[in-house]
Every structure is written in C-alpha cells, then in structure tokens.
C-alpha cells in the first residue's frame, strides 16, 4: 500500500475539494494517460487495485507511471464509540483528486493494449475517467 514514510503532522482537517486540477493535468511521461473527470478522495487500496489491473493486462511489456500519491490521512473512531474524547486515530491515507488530474500513464505498448488496460483500471476507480493521448508540443525543438 502507498503511504507516506513520515509526516510532519499526523492528522489533517478534511478541507474542500473544489475547482479543476491545475497541476498534473497533462500526460508528461507516457504515451497515454488516465484522466479523472470528477473530484474524489482516492484511497491507497483503490490506486493499488487499478495499478494491478494495468500490470495484469500489459503483462511484461510497457512502463506504468502512478501520478498520484495518497498523502492525506483520514481518521476514524472505533465502532460503537460515543462522540467526543478527541479526534480518532489515522485509519488510512487518500489522494485528493480534482477533475482533470492525470492518474496513471502508460508507454511502450500498442495503442489498443494501452486503451484496454486503462479502461480496466478505470473500472476499479470510484469516479468517471477518460483516456487521453500525449499531446506533443508542435514546433518545440
């Protein structure tokens, strides 16, 4: 599972997830990317399930980049516990996803294989996604 090695502060407030992604919204490393179309908190388990789906489909070929990392701690209190007596312990970590964010990238495989692998990954995720090709900058030399 993905989680930070060490953190400055153990617990965080929830915050608001508004607006579009301004960072990480272009395919930077691979040839194809999986773009989020909705806002969500994505758990490390969901990210791992999607990664496994891609890896299983491309077998030994290709390279996968995971462009998101779960660095936000989510706390939970034990079941059947009365309210009060402080904030609960850290239960798991999530990545905050905004619309337009590239989640995974893939390179080194045929276009139809990449498309199918990313579609299988998208089915494992709690949001709608779309597959985007890399847009190489024209005339940038």
UniProtKB/Swiss-Prot annotation:
NCBIfam families: rplP_bact. Part of the 50S ribosomal subunit. GO terms for molecular function: rRNA binding; structural constituent of ribosome; tRNA binding. Keywords: Ribonucleoprotein, Ribosomal protein, RNA-binding, rRNA-binding, tRNA-binding. This is Large ribosomal subunit protein uL16. Belongs to the universal ribosomal protein uL16 family. It holds the Pfam family Ribosomal_L16. Binds 23S rRNA and is also seen to make contacts with the A and possibly P site tRNAs. Disulfide bonds: none annotated. GO terms for biological process: translation. Residues 1-21 are annotated as: Disordered. InterPro entries: Ribosomal_uL16 (IPR047873), Ribosomal_uL16_bact-type (IPR000114), Ribosomal_uL16_CS (IPR020798), Ribosomal_uL16_dom (IPR016180), Ribosomal_uL16_sf (IPR036920). GO terms for cellular component: cytosolic large ribosomal subunit. It comes from the Bacteria. It comes from Roseiflexus sp. (strain RS-1).
